[in-house]
Design a protein with these regions (language model features):
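Active-site-proximal helices and loops of the catalytic beta/alpha 8
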Residues: 1-175
Length: 175
């Protein structure tokens, strides 16, 4: 998922491949403390809040797996304490040395879009899910359905930069 959102790709296969673990036993995240702190190929630093939210929507709206949201340290982007030269080679890194243990981190976890996906997941507990793209790899659709219009729902993450017309889009939702 992290690699997909780094390259601005919401292809459904990135959100449904659970190799070596069954979906009901998977733990999903966009980034973790380890990828963030260890500076794997600069991926954490390159992820904007917008793309973290797209990834979060894709992993959290589904039926199976537990989703974890990493709360980045406050004002990330500083050095690792290596004499001013961070692991990234330019003096920047994920820690500013302004944060102390127990300090609040980023407020992104409180974002209304993050909260909406969390509410969607909670409202759809136990319902089947289907993950697909809505026309291209910049529009991800997660359907949750029980066969009743009153119980069915859909989450759409649209990274196209403009409104997406979903008319005629095939779904598993009840009419």
């Amino acid at each position: 998922v992290r690699n997909a959102v780094q390259f601005k790709n919401l292809g459904a296969s990135h959100f449904t491949s659970h190799s070596k673990v069954t979906e009901d036993k998977s733990v999903n995240w966009v980034e973790s403390h380890d990828n963030f702190a260890n500076g794997e190929a600069n991926i954490p630093q390159e992820l904007s809040d917008e793309w973290i939210k797209y990834g979060w929507a894709g992993v959290t709206a589904q039926k199976n797996g537990m989703s974890l949201f990493f709360d980045r340290p406050y004002k990330d982007g500083g050095t690792y304490g290596t004499g001013g030269v961070g692991t990234y080679g330019n003096g920047s890194g994920p820690f500013t040395e302004n944060s102390k243990l127990g300090d609040a981190g980023s407020d992104l976890w409180k974002d209304p879009e993050v909260a909406a996906v969390n509410h969607f997941r909670n409202a759809m507990v136990g319902e089947a899910s289907n993950v697909s793209n809505c026309g291209d790899d910049n529009c991800l659709m997660v359907e949750r359905y029980a066969g009743s219009a009153a119980q069915d729902g859909m989450m759409v993450a649209n990274a196209n930069g403009s409104d997406k017309n979903l008319a005629g889009q095939s779904t598993k939702l009840a009419n």
